[in-house]
C-alpha cells in the first residue's frame, strides 16, 4: 500500500515544476499543523515511531508493511499511531484491541476512507469492500448475507463436491500443473455458487482472466497515491475531455457493468424457464424487490464475488500445498483420519465433515498460518473516540494487523509452525478461540465488515483439501543426492489482492494405483 504511494510521489516530484512542489509542501504543512492543533486540543494519540516533517512515517514502510507493523507492536504495544503525510493512522495488533474497537464500537469503526477511483468511478459505488458505511452498503451487505450465510451456503455443497471430483481428476492427469488446476477449481467453485455455472474449462480462461483483471484494476486503483484525485477530490468533477484517467475509468465501468448484467440476464432467463439450480444470483433476483436493489446493484454484488473469492481461495489452496510439502507428518495424520472414516470406495463428502475434526482443524491452520490478506482494507473513524486514555480523532485511518494477531504467541504458541492440533483438545474435539467468531483465526476480518463469503470459502477449502488428501501424496521433489528439495517457507509474493507463496515445486502422486478408475466410476455415478 505505502510502496505504491511512494512510487507515485517520486514520479510526480520528478515531473512537477518548482511552483507545484512549493504549493504541495505548503498544503501538506498546513494540513499537518491543523491536524496537530486539533489533535492536541482533545488528547494524545497512541504512541508510535517518529517520522519526518510533513511526510511522517510513509518512508519507513516497506512493500510488505505488516512485517514492520509487527516489529513496532513489540516496541509500542498492541495499538500505535502513524502519520501518513498529515493523515492520522492507528494500527491494531491484538484480539483485545480489535474486539474493543472494531467489534464493540463498530458504529464508529465500520466506515471506509474515500476511494474515488476504485469505489466511485470504476464501480459506481457498488463494490461493497470499498463502499462507505451508509445506506447503500447496508442494503448490499444485507442482501449478500442472505445469500451467503451458513444455511444458504449449504445449498451450494453438491456443486462444490462436483468441483472437487473434477479437481482431483485434473490433478491426476497433469500433476505438474497443480497450481493451474487449483486456480481453475477455485474460480469454478465460486462461479458455480454465484451463477450455478457448469465447471469451468480452459475454454473459459478468457472470461476468468477478464474478471481477474477487473479485480486487479480495482485493487491497484485503491492504493494510496495511485491517482491525484485521491489527494485533490475536486478533480473528480473535471470534464472527461480534460481527465483521461476519468474517461478511461468510466469506460471500464461501462464494460464491466455490461458483462455483469449479461450474467444476470442469463440467470433470469433460466429462472423464467423453471430450469435452474440454486445460486447466489438467483436468490438475489428472487429477493431483489424486497431488498430494494436495482439490476445493476445485484449484478455488481454477484459479479465481484467471483473475482475476490477465486483469488483468495486459490491462494489458500496454494498455502495448503506448501504446508503439506513441509509437514509430511501432518499430511499423513489427516490422510489416516480420512481413510478410517471414508475408506477407498468413495470420496469424502460434506456429510463427513462433522466426523473429520483434524481435517477441519487443518483448514483453519491453513488460514491462520499464512493469511492471504495480512492486513485488512483500512477503515476510517466516523467520529472522535477515546480508548484507554488515547485520543483517536474522526477521520483516522484504522488498519487491523491480521498477520500479528494470527501469530500472537499468547494464543498460538510456536505460531510459525503448521500445527492443526492447536485447534483440538486432548479428546480430538475442536477448541473455540475467543474473538474469532468460531473460525480459530481472524483472517476473515472483524465486526460488520467480516468477510461476507467466508462460509462458502470454508466449504470449498474443506472439500478440495479432503479430496486431495484422499487421492494424493503431496511431497517435496528429490534432488540428485536423494534428499528432498524443500520450498521456502517465507518466500511469498504480494499480488495486490492476495499474499500467496512464491512459485515452488512439489510432487503430486496417487496414493493407490487404480485411483483413476475409481474417480471415473465416482463421476459416472454422481
Swiss-Prot record:
One of its GO terms (cellular component) is membrane. Its EC number is 1.-.-.-. Gene3D superfamilies: Cytochrome P450. InterPro entries: Cyt_P450, Cyt_P450_E_grp-I, Cyt_P450_sf, Cytochrome_P450_fung. Keywords: Heme, Iron, Membrane, Metal-binding, Monooxygenase, Oxidoreductase, Transmembrane, Transmembrane helix. Its main location: membrane. It is a multi-pass membrane protein. GO terms for molecular function: heme binding; iron ion binding; monooxygenase activity; oxidoreductase activity, acting on paired donors, with incorporation or reduction of molecular oxygen. SUPFAM superfamilies: Cytochrome P450. CDD domains: CYP64-like. The chain crosses the membrane at residues 13-33, 115-135, 306-326. Its cofactor is heme. Pathway: Secondary metabolite biosynthesis. It comes from the Eukaryota. The keyword Chaperone does not apply. It is found in: Membrane. The keyword Heme applies. Heme binds at residue 451. Belongs to the cytochrome P450 family. This is Cytochrome P450 monooxygenase 58. It comes from Postia placenta (strain ATCC 44394 / Madison 698-R). The gene is CYP058.
Amino acid at each position: 500500500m505505502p510502496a505504491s504511494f511512494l512510487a507515485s510521489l517520486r514520479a510526480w516530484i520528478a515531473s512537477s515544476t518548482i511552483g507545484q512542489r512549493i504549493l504541495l509542501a505548503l498544503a501538506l504543512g498546513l494540513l499537518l499543523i491543523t491536524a496537530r492543533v486539533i489533535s492536541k486540543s482533545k488528547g494524545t494519540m497512541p504512541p508510535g515511531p517518529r517520522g519526518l516533517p510533513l511526510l511522517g512515517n510513509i518512508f519507513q514502510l516497506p512493500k510488505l508493511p505488516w512485517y514492520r507493523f509487527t516489529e513496532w507492536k513489540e516496541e509500542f504495544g498492541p495499538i500505535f499511531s502513524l502519520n501518513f503525510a498529515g493523515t492520522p493512522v492507528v494500527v491494531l495488533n491484538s484480539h483485545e484491541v480489535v474486539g474493543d474497537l472494531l467489534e464493540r464500537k463498530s458504529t464508529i469503526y465500520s466506515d471506509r476512507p474515500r476511494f474515488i477511483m476504485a469505489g466511485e468511478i470504476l464501480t459506481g459505488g457498488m463494490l461493497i469492500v470499498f463502499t462507505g458505511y451508509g445506506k447503500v452498503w447496508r442494503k448490499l451487505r444485507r442482501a449478500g448475507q442472505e445469500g451467503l450465510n451458513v444455511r444458504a451456503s449449504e445449498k451450494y455443497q453438491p456443486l462444490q463436491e462436483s468441483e472437487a471430483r473434477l479437481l482431483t481428476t485434473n490433478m491426476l492427469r497433469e500433476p505438474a500443473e497443480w497450481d493451474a488446476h487449483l486456480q481453475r477449481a477455485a474460480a469454478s467453485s465460486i462461479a458455480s455458487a454465484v451463477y450455478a455455472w457448469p465447471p469451468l474449462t480452459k475454454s473459459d480462461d478468457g472470461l476468468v482472466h477478464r474478471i481477474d483483471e477487473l479485480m486487479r484494476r480495482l485493487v491497484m486503483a485503491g492504493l494510496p497515491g495511485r491517482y491525484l484525485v485521491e489527494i485533490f477530490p475536486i478533480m473528480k468533477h473535471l470534464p472527461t475531455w480534460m481527465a483521461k484517467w476519468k474517461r478511461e475509468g468510466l469506460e471500464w465501468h461501462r464494460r464491466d457493468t455490461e458483462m455483469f448484467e449479461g450474467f444476470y440476464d442469463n440467470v433470469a432467463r433460466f429462472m423464467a424457464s423453471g430450469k435452474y439450480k440454486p445460486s447466489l444470483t438467483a436468490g438475489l433476483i428472487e429477493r431483489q424487490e424486497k431488498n430494494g436493489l436495482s439490476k445493476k446493484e445485484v449484478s455488481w454484488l454477484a459479479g465481484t464475488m467471483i473475482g475476490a473469492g477465486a483469488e483468495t481461495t486459490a491462494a489458500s489452496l496454494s498455502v495448503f500445498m506448501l504446508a503439506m510439502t513441509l509437514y509430511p507428518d501432518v499430511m499423513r495424520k489427516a490422510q489416516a483420519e480420512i481413510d478410517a472414516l471414508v475408506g477407498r470406495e468413495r470420496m469424502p463428502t460434506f456429510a463427513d465433515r462433522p466426523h473429520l475434526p483434524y481435517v477441519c482443524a487443518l483448514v483453519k491452520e491453513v488460514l491462520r498460518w499464512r493469511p492471504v490478506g495480512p492486513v485488512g482494507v483500512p477503515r476510517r473513524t466516523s467520529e472522535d473516540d477515546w480508548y484507554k486514555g488515547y485520543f483517536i480523532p474522526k477521520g483516522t485511518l484504522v488498519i487491523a494487523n491480521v498477520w500479528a494477531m494470527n501469530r500472537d504467541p499468547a494464543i498460538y504458541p510456536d505460531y510459525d509452525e503448521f500445527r492443526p492440533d492447536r485447534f483440538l483438545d486432548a479428546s480430538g474435539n475442536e477448541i473455540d478461540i475467543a474473538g474469532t467468531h468460531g473460525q480459530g483465526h481472524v483472517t476473515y476480518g472483524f465486526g460488520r465488515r467480516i468477510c461476507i463469503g467466508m462460509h462458502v470459502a470454508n466449504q470449498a477449502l474443506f472439500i478440495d483439501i479432503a479430496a486431495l488428501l484422499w487421492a494424493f501424496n503431496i511431497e517435496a521433489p528429490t534432488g540428485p543426492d536423494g534428499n528432498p528439495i524443500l520450498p521456502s517457507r517465507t518466500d511469498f509474493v504480494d499480488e495486490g489482492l492476495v499474499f500467496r507463496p512464491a512459485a515452488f515445486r512439489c510432487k503430486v502422486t496417487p496414493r493407490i494405483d487404480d485411483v483413476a478408475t475409481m474417480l471415473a466410476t465416482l463421476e459416472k455415478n454422481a
